């Protein structure tokens, strides 16, 4: 018999997370490491678990995540986005709750491109009057 699993893709900045939900006891594994070991910060661990806590499904699923690109904050955000999408696939009744919390919305903020004549996106070279 095939195992029941749900899938969601999450994106944030340059990070892309592929999230798989499998019935289990609530383990969260990111790139074959425990979530706290991978991200190294309690705040990012909390960000990842937000959709589970909001929907009271913490002990119902094991979460398996493959995430690439970006930095730790972007990866945590991408994981949260993918997890929310996977939860909606598992139970469509959770959609309004997750939508209201903003977990199903792709955060459109991206790094601004560097412009020629400037050092960074907006940082101009030092100006000297004399």
From Swiss-Prot:
Q: Where is this region: Disordered?
A: 108-130
The UniProt record lists the keyword Phosphoprotein:
no
Query: One GO molecular function term?
Result: RNA binding
Q: Which GO terms describe its cellular component?
A: cytosolic small ribosomal subunit
Instruction: Return the Basic residues bias intervals.
Output: 111-130
Recorded family membership: Belongs to the universal ribosomal protein uS9 family.
- Which HAMAP family does the annotation name? Ribosomal_uS9_B
Which named protein is this? Small ribosomal subunit protein uS9
Which species?
Answer: Desulforamulus reducens (strain ATCC BAA-1160 / DSM 100696 / MI-1) (Desulfotomaculum reducens)
